[in-house]
Amino acid sequence: MDPVPSTQTQKWPGKHADLDPEPSLLRYCDGRVHVGSGKLAEKKTLLTGGDSGIGKAAAVMFAREGSDLVISCLPEERDDAEVTRDLIEREGRNCWIWEGKLDKSDNCRDLVDFALKKLGWIDVLVNNIAYQQVAQSIEDIDDEQWDLTFKTNIFSFFWVTKAAISHMKSGSSIVNCSSINAYVGRPDLLDYTSTKGAITAFTRGLSNQYAQHGIRVNAVAPGPIYTPLVSSTFPKEKIELSDQVPLGRMGQPVEVASCYLFLACSDGGYMTGQTLHPNGGTVINN
C-alpha cells in the first residue's frame, strides 16, 4: 500500500470524495479485496458517521457481510453519505440515511427512533462520529470548542447508546471508536484526547453492566488513518504522520473497519470491555 500524499488539506468536516487518492474501503495492503462470508447475515446495524473515512468503510464492509444499515451524517456531508448508501445497495443490502447533528440528546433519540422504524431492531451499534480541532495550549481552547468536542465525541455515544440498548437483545454488540490519543496524550488535541479517554472508560463500565444480558461492548483505538477527519484538522505539513509509525505509513479505513467487523460479529464473541489498536505498531499499555 503506497504512502499517503501529505499535501492535502480540506475545510472541516472534510469530504471523502475530494481525497486523492481515494481512501481504501475494501482493499487491504496486500491488494486483496474483502470477501464477505455472511458474518452479519440478516443483522441490523446503526452506525454513526457513515458518510466518510472509517465509518464509510465499516458500513460497506458490514453490508458485504449481510447487514442492513442506518447511517448518520452531517447536513454538509449528505453527498458522501449518499455514495455510501449506493455502495451498500450494490451489495444487495438496504441503507437509510439520518441527517443531522448528534450534539443534543433529542437528536440522538430521534436517530434511534428512525433506525428502529427503518430496521425493526438493532443488532449492532457503532458509535463512530468525532470532532477535533488543533489547539497548541489549554489556553487556546475556548468553552465553545470544549463543549462541542465533548458533546459530539462522548455525550453522543452515551445518548445514542442509552436510547438504543433497551432494543438490543442477547448476542448484540456495541463498538465505540476511541483513539490512540487516549493512550499517548497528544498535546495539540487536548479536548479530543480527553473525550477518547472517556470513551475507553465508558466502554469498560458499560461492558460490565451488560455482560449479564449477553450484550458485548468493545472499542477500537485507531492510530493515524487516511480520512477526511485528518485532512480537515491538520495543516499539510503535519498530515503525513508515517514517520511516527513503526510500519512507516498511515493506515487505511479498511484496516480499522475490519476491527469493527471482528468485534461486531461472532468472531469476537468472547471479547467484551476490550480495545483493539490498529495503529501501525505503536505499543500501547492498557
UniProtKB/Swiss-Prot annotation:
Single GO term (MF): 3-hydroxyacyl-CoA dehydrogenase activity
InterPro entries assigned: NAD(P)-bd_dom_sf, Sc_DH/Rdtase_CS, SDR_fam
Class of enzymatic activity (EC top level): oxidoreductase
BP GO terms, sorted: fatty acid metabolic process
This protein's name: Uncharacterized oxidoreductase C4H3.08
Active site per database record: S178, Y192, K196
Similarity comment: family membership: Belongs to the short-chain dehydrogenases/reductases (SDR) family.
